[in-house]
Swiss-Prot record:
NCBIfam families: L-threonylcarbamoyladenylate synthase. It comes from Colwellia psychrerythraea (strain 34H / ATCC BAA-681) (Vibrio psychroerythus). This is Threonylcarbamoyl-AMP synthase. The lineage of its organism: Bacteria, Pseudomonadati, Pseudomonadota, Gammaproteobacteria, Alteromonadales. One of its GO terms (molecular function) is L-threonylcarbamoyladenylate synthase. One of its GO terms (biological process) is tRNA threonylcarbamoyladenosine modification.
Length: 183
């Protein structure tokens, strides 16, 4: 991967296709509203659903979550689940765009160990938005070679790495209640 080019694409509001734990994701800078709108349009995804933030560390998530609403015991449990392909719903920072959180009071976040994503997050010092690399309702791509032709022509950068080999998309858990939203 050309780290300079992917970082440049990210910082310039580009849409990036990249490997996650199980499937390829599409993402962008979570602070760039135009990029978020473009991503949702590309995916044909309702803005009400919200998106996931994928990070290399918990500190990268802090500007987007309301850490003060997470009790210490729940925070310890939350942190113990990572990095393990588990997405968790946490209280959102009310200053974030509703394009990230959808119609919810929470935001979906995950810390990954996928090395290409960790490197990107470290170089930009922020998380990347994550949604599966497919049109809504279709199967997500598991390799960069299997990206939908329409999608691949509309992204600004394809990180040609590999997934971590998981067989299904991430489990989603409400971090405060422990309720499993998606298994």
């Amino acid at each position: 991967m050309s780290e300079k080019n992917v970082v440049e694409a990210f910082k310039n509001g580009g849409i990036i296709a990249y490997p996650t734990e199980a499937v390829f994701g599409l993402g962008c800078d979570p602070d760039n509203k135009e990029a978020l709108k473009r991503l949702l349009k590309l995916k044909q995804r309702s803005p009400e659903k919200g998106l996931i933030l994928l990070a290399g560390s918990y500190s990268q998530l802090l500007p987007y979550i309301d850490d003060s609403k997470i009790p210490q015991d729940k925070r310890l449990t939350l942190l113990s689940r990572w990095p393990d392909g588990i997405t968790q719903l946490v209280p959102k920072n009310n200053n974030i765009s509703s394009l990230l959180s959808g119609s919810f009071d929470t935001i979906a976040v995950r810390i990954t160990s996928q090395p290409d994503v960790v490197a990107l997050c470290q170089q930009t010092n922020k998380p990347i938005v994550s949604t599966s690399a497919n049109l809504s309702g279709q199967e997500p791509a598991k390799t960069w070679q299997s990206l939908d032709l329409v999608l691949s022509k509309q992204v600004d950068f394809i990180l040609k790495g590999v997934t971590l080999g998981r067989t299904s998309p991430s489990k989603i858990i409400d971090a405060l209640t422990g309720k499993i939203i998606r298994n």
